[in-house]
């Protein structure tokens, strides 16, 4: 299964795996699954780290974190393509969930045929045309 890791899942997997649910941990550890992190998440971590958002302050410098995850866990990097951005027009816009990072990750998962691994209640609360797992 191709798993697109939501930003917080990527951070937890890399630095605090004890925060992952048992299911999420098992999915990340399963060698049959392909783990993918989006450039969107890397961008989100960088921005929120600079803003001092506690949940995105990573102990390891971001470039080293990405390098180590690619080497140790074979995490692939997903670039942002125009098809991902154009897929946003087909997503419903919910007043309680307008996060542009989340919306682009959802669009990427749809276009790439990936399952989005996220613990974000807002994503699970709404009906998006994507497979979401916790």
Locations of the language-model features?
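Short, well-structured N-terminal submotif of metal-dependent ribonuclease cores
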Residues: 1-37, 53-66, 112, 126
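Conserved beta-strand segments of alpha/beta enzyme cores
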Residues: 34, 76, 115, 129-131
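Short, basic/aromatic-enriched C-terminal tail that caps enzymatic domains
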Residues: 121-134
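Active-site neighborhoods of divalent-metal-dependent phosphate/nucleic-acid chemistry enzymes
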Residues: 72-119
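Alpha-helix capping/helix-boundary segments
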Residues: 9, 41, 84, 105, ...
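Phosphate/NTP-binding elements of NTP-utilizing enzymes
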Residues: 45
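A secondary-structure boundary/capping signal
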Residues: 6, 38-41, 81, 119
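Residue-level signal for well-ordered alpha-helical positions
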Residues: 16-17, 48-51, 91, 129-130
């Amino acid at each position: 299964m191709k798993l697109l890791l939501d930003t917080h899942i990527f951070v937890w997997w890399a630095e605090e795996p004890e925060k992952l649910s048992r299911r999420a941990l098992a999915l990340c550890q399963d060698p049959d699954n392909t783990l993918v992190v989006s450039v969107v998440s890397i961008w989100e971590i960088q921005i929120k780290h600079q803003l001092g958002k506690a949940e995105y302050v990573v102990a390891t410098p971001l470039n080293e974190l990405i390098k180590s995850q690619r080497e140790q866990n074979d995490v692939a990097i997903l670039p942002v393509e125009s098809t991902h951005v154009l897929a946003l027009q087909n997503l419903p816009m919910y007043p309680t969930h307008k996060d542009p990072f989340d919306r682009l990750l959802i669009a990427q998962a749809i276009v790439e045929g990936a399952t989005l691994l996220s613990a974000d209640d807002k994503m699970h609360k709404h009906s998006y045309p994507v497979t979401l797992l916790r």
